[in-house]
Design a protein with these regions (language model features):
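Acidic anion/phosphate-binding donor-loop and adjacent secondary structure
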Residues: 113-115, 156-178
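Nucleotide-sugar-dependent
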Residues: 194-229, 236-244
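Active-site donor-binding acidic/aromatic loop of nucleotide-activated sugar
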Residues: 186-196
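Short beta-strand->alpha-helix junction loop in the catalytic core
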Residues: 45-47, 139, 154-167, 183-184
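Extended catalytic core of nucleotide-activated donor transferases of GT-like folds
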Residues: 48-129, 135-142
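A charged, aromatic-enriched C-terminal amphipathic alpha-helix characteristic of glycosyltransferases
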Residues: 258-263, 270-315
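N-terminal pre-catalytic "stem/leader" segment of glycosyltransferase-like enzymes
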Residues: 1-81, 94-99, 313-314
Length: 315
């Protein structure tokens, strides 16, 4: 029995600049580290292809998958032609006793319309074809279950892994705010624009950009993971999906209104900041090492193959 994960292979530019391709590749790398094999595919140009041609291509991709295998599909698959995903799942289901999980990067109908009450879109129907959904966080899982009418088992991953390079810097001015949101106007913020994270992780807090839509408030923040990867505690709005995780593990400051940050920092001592730095340390290492995808992969085996379900699997 083999465990598989899909990986999209785009251009050099895409893998260097497109966040979806970057995260897809890093996830496949993490899965390989825990024993998964990779099914590689490309962003195919299929708009003018006949259904038979699409089926042939998909059949070739799945030629190594055998009965009783497990497959994690990174979803969506980033194909211009919707037939590819549909046929891909249909072909998998023809293989006896194969278990299929979706590593869900985006809920496309909600991303496009910001209508989180829409559970009837054809893309939502595709999600119901899986045996398990690996979703970003519990808030999104609840929304998918309640509004998306998805009754599948779901496992909340927790954080987006971000495999950055470089050594963590010693932290100096703990009242500095590292800010990458162009909407910010607070005087105490230090605006770094596109400065690489490794060059600006020398102290203070990383300000997680506010959610620009209802959908964003239900998804995992890549900026949060970037700050944690460099060892920075964060400032995050209370309405965001990962605010409770930050509060629970003392990874930063949770605020209803960013304007309250002056008062919070005025009352903070260097000892308070050091406690947050210490708390961030283990999470920084986890994000940098691909821990969250690795855990999701191993949990998928436990849930779907071993049929063990306990509190670790948020079903």
């Amino acid at each position: 029995m083999t465990n598989w994960i899909t990986k999209i292979n785009g251009s050099v530019v895409q893998h260097a600049t497109d966040v979806h391709f970057i995260l897809n590749g890093q996830a496949a790398e993490s899965a390989e580290a825990v024993g998964f094999s990779v099914i590689n595919y490309a962003p195919y140009q299929l708009r003018d292809a006949a259904d038979e041609d699409v089926e042939t291509r998909v059949t070739t991709l799945l030629s190594g998958v055998q009965p009783d295998d497990l497959l994690i599909v990174q979803w969506p698959m980033w194909q211009a032609d919707a037939r590819f995903e549909k046929i891909f799942i249909e072909k998998i289901r023809l293989i006896p006793r194969v278990k299929v999980a979706a590593l869900l990067w985006e809920v496309m109908p909600w991303l496009m319309t910001d209508d989180l009450s829409d559970g009837t879109h054809p893309e939502m129907t595709k999600l119901r074809d899986f045996d398990l959904l690996l979703v970003g966080n519990p808030k999104l899982a609840v929304q998918l279950r309640d509004s998306g009418n998805i009754a599948l088992p779901m496992l909340a991953i927790g954080l987006i892994d971000f495999k950055c390079q470089g050594l963590l810097k010693a932290k100096t001015d703990f009242k500095d705010l590292v800010f990458r949101d162009s909407n910010g106007t607070e005087e105490e913020m230090s605006y770094h624009g596109q400065t690489p994270f490794i060059a600006m992780a020398d102290g203070g807090f990383g300000v997680v950009p506010a959610a620009r839509s209802q959908y964003e408030a239900h998804t995992n923040s890549l900026e949060l993971s970037k700050y944690l990867s460099m060892g920075l505690p964060v400032v995050i709005r209370a309405n965001m999906a990962q605010a409770e995780l930050v509060r629970l593990h003392n990874l930063g400051i949770v605020l209803d209104d960013l304007n309250a940050i002056d008062a919070v920092l005025a009352d903070m001592t260097i000892m308070d900041y050091q406690e947050k730095l210490t708390a961030v340390g283990a999470w920084s290492e986890a994000v940098r090492s691909g821990y969250f995808v690795k855990r999701a992969c191993l949990e998928s085996i436990r849930i779907l193959k071993l049929r063990e379900v306990d509190y670790l699997a948020e079903i």
